[in-house]
Amino acid sequence: RQAKSYAEGEGAQEASVLDLYFQQITSNKYLEERIFNSILSKDEIADAASSELASIRRKIRQQSAKIRESLQKIITSTSYAKILQEPIVTIRSDRFVVPVKAECKGQLPGLVHDVSSSGSTYFIEPMSAVNGNNELRELFMAERKEIERILAELSAESADHREQIKLDYDVLLELECIFARARLSFAMRAI
């Protein structure tokens, strides 16, 4: 699209032998917008990629907040103040946990997910958070599945246009070589 825009804008001032190349380039605005609106980076898919993904991510945020709120009650409770290493909620092995002093680990019923390198802190998922964390894990699995579905759909749509994409690629490659030779000639003052 950028090459086509160049040909129609800055490059369109006068006829050129390159016009034949630019005329061969086609753009598929629908596919382009679909990809750019779905893929934010190599690691991130937009919520707007599908209504299902947006819904799942909304549920993830709600469930995370619910678990944090539940654990917040524990870390602010005076009855647990002496056993906590710090009054914070953290994440270990994709589970919300609280840091408990090693010598007090048996005083908070729950599952141990990690131990600090010094061995002085146990990261425990209180039993009251297990069901919530399980629901959160299921939501993360649903999110991964939906992302895979979206990427498969985009791949299939791209595959439907593979011949034109290949032709455009070949033309753009040729144009890149022409411009590279021109830049080199200009840099060497070999014009």
List the predicted regions and their residue ranges.
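Extended, EK/Q-rich alpha-helical coiled-coil segments that serve as long dimerization/scaffolding arms
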Residues: 22-33
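Alpha-helical coupling/stalk and coiled-coil linker elements that connect catalytic or binding modules
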Residues: 12, 16, 32-191
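Long, charged all-alpha helical bundle/coiled-coil segments in cytosolic proteins
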Residues: 1-22
